[in-house]
Amino acid sequence: MTQTLETLYSQLTGHAPESVEALPGAGSNRSYYRLKGTPTLIGVCGTSREENEAFIYLSRHFQAQHLPVPAVHAVSNDGLCYLQDDLGTDSLFQLIAHGRETGEFGSTEKDLLKKVIRLLPRIQFEGAQGLDFGKCYPAVEFNHRSILWDLNYFKYCFLKATGVEFREDLLEDDFEALCQTLIKSMEPQPVFMYRDFQSRNIMVKDGEPYLIDFQGGRKGPLYYDVASFLWQAKANYPDSLRQELIDEYLEALRPYKQIEKEVFLSRLRHVVLFRTLQVLGAYGFRGYFEKKTHFIESIPFAIENLRQLLQEGFPEYPYLCEVLQRMTELKQFAAARNRRNLTVTVMSFSYRKGIPEDESGNGGGYVFDCRAVHNPGRYEQYKSLTGLDRPVIEFLEKDGEITEFLRHTDALVDAHVQRFLERGFSHLMICFGCTGGQHRSVYSAQHTAMHLHKKFKINVHLIHREQQIDQLLKAK
């Protein structure tokens, strides 16, 4: 693919690029490259010709409407690769990092967010003028069929993966009710629905926002993109800021459409619920099945958004809300309640009963085998005791093997926790196993949990699986 991009670049400029640099991937199967030279361009390679054609058509249409999007300069004969403007390296998501991490957005961050949200009505209405929606991919419009696609995406790729039991017929009834509510929110005049209008898909160059990743856009309700932007899982916007940005949006919307704020909010909440479920479906597929870390890390944030939505209630969808409430209360989503803190799960277990499964989906951490350490369980006086009992503790510490063992595991775990804190990760799992999950593993897990809780400002979820002990040590 890079050879195709280099050929396109040479045909366009008359010379080869100075270098080709692979860029981090996102949620799709497209690959991105920076081709440095005069000029520097972004190369895109996709697996779907139809998806690429949609982006190229929309880019050219939006440019004709004087909307800030990257220009497409060259397309390969097979339609799978193309070159577009390089908008730099600053995404809106990166530029609001301080606010996202602290929950306190400064004036510069707020001004930038307001500039972006005021751009949205232009995209929705001016972008729709003269647009051939038949060229949109994979759907022409937001309709009954596409809504049910997304709801079933959530059901099969996320809800079923959690293990929550539910009645298919009752859930489908509420899906249908939500579908009808959403269809009623459509405007009679054409509105372009960006679909994934969120801070990762906004680049900022010379202080001005530019739009990328709009190839999934279609005709749809104006509420959807507001929901996508303001309820982005990891954006961490406080409700007061959301209200400010809604006011900015409604003010910018006036030249195109007049709508009372109360009416707008009453319709928006249903779209926010739908968008949250759609996002969880994507996180389930991209995270649980494709094992992409960014999506797994975003799940606790989306769960917290859902938890807040359910507090307001949706009497129109009683069974759906009941199922969602049970889902948000699952143990694997406990970290979402303390989403600014890392949660480390420390567990003891018996190898006879299998290695514990990481229910967070993250798959990060260690499984330490304690079976090489001198076993108190071999002696009659300790067989009925556990690694929490004083006689077993004294035996292990006097023997000394476990002290040396834990000196090494502490060093590994401490470095891992420190790095996860620096990178803003939400979950790490540390397991200690022995033959019966009673003596050595219990002592080791207890020691490690207390050590981590004392040393770091983190939540420690301590589980002695075979002893049926489950304890959450909250960050100090």
Predicted regions, residues:
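ATP/Mg2+ or Mg2+-diphosphate-binding catalytic cores
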Residues: G281-R337
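ATP-binding pocket architecture of kinase catalytic cores
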Residues: Y33-W149, Y153, K160
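An alpha-helical support segment within catalytic cores of ATP-dependent transferases
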Residues: L5, A128-V140, D150-M193, E262
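Active-site activation/catalytic loop segments of kinase-like enzymes and analogous catalytic loops
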Residues: N152-A161, L222-Q258, L273-F289, A302-L309
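Juxta-kinase regulatory segment immediately upstream of eukaryotic protein kinase catalytic domains
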Residues: M1-P17
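C-terminal accessory "lid"/substrate-recognition subdomains
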Residues: A334-L428, Q468-D470
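ATP-binding glycine-rich phosphate-binding loop
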Residues: H15-Y33
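Active-site acidic catalytic loop and adjacent metal/ATP-binding pocket
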Residues: S31-L35, I123, C179-V226, N236
